[in-house]
């Protein structure tokens, strides 16, 4: 097979101090891929023709991969995505980051909500982790992990209603996190969220209420997203260790 390159230009360029390029994974649906870049673009590309179908301004640099879900009632695909706080930070290194629900066919913004964040030189705040889509008793929610909100060291996990964009619950975290939230389920379908943070904590939360059910500390910053198989969680830390943890 031949290697195909797709080139593009935007109104934001390196001369405006924006960095061009992509640091997150694409998501795909049918014969389209959806990808974010460092200059605040979310783009839909037809992979059969390599043509740009649409581009949506999502305001800032996105390090989080977009996630896509098809509404079973309508058959319409939607994308959930957010950004870091980078180019849009003010002189005090603070600002609002957006969370979007976007129509995958048209690029239309269905809803948008914002959260105030902090950033420091070289280490931006905002959403650095991919959102978590869920099922069973958690259906109707999407989870975002927000770094450096409520203070430079703090964070927040939020559960958002997918239809309205309203916040269902939020949990303030003493330490910010870059790890993506992961959903796990009991045999009867009750959902829980696992979230790791920059102080080495692994939290287990009730996905319906946000109540923290348990926390263990693994010693060092956890930037990786845990992998879960049956009742075993596996995750690596900045302490050069890989842990296996049993869910009970």
For each of these PLM feature ranges, what is it?
Residues 1, 46-50, 103-106, 161-164, ...:
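Short loop/turn segments that connect beta-strands within beta-propeller blades
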Residues 20, 39, 94-96, 153-154, ...:
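A detector of repeated loop/turn-to-beta-strand junctions in beta-rich toroidal repeat architectures
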Residues 28-29, 39, 74, 85, ...:
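Acidic/polar residues in short coil/turn loops that connect beta-strands
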Residues 41, 84-90, 148-152, 200-201, ...:
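Short glycine/acidic-enriched loop and turn motifs that connect beta-strands
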Residues 218-248:
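Blade-level signature of beta-propeller repeat domains, shared across WD40, Kelch, NHL, RCC1
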């Amino acid at each position: 097979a031949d290697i195909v390159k797709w080139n593009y230009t935007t109104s934001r360029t390196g001369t405006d101090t924006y960095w061009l390029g992509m640091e997150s994974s694409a998501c795909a649906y049918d014969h389209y891929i959806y990808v974010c870049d460092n200059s605040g673009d979310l783009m839909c590309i037809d992979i059969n023709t390599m043509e740009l179908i649409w581009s949506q301004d999502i305001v800032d640099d996105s390090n989080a991969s977009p996630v896509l879900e098809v509404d079973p009632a309508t058959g319409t695909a939607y994308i959930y995505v957010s950004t870091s706080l980078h180019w849009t930070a003010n002189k005090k290194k603070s600002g609002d980051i957006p969370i979007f629900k976007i129509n995958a066919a048209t690029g239309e913004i269905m809803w948008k909500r914002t959260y105030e964040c902090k950033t420091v030189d070289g280490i931006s705040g905002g959403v650095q982790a991919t959102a978590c889509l869920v099922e069973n008793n958690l259906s109707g929610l999407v989870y975002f992990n927000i770094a450096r909100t409520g203070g430079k060291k703090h964070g927040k996990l939020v559960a958002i209603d997918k239809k309205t964009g309203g916040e269902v619950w939020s949990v303030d975290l003493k330490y910010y996190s870059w790890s993506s939230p992961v959903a796990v389920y009991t045999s009867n379908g009750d959902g829980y969220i696992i979230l790791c943070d920059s102080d080495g904590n692994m939290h287990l939360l009730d996905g319906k209420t946000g109540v923290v059910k348990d926390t263990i500390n693994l010693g060092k910053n956890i930037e990786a997203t845990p992998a879960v198989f049956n009742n075993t969680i596996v995750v690596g830390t900045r302490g050069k260790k890989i842990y296996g943890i049993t869910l009970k």
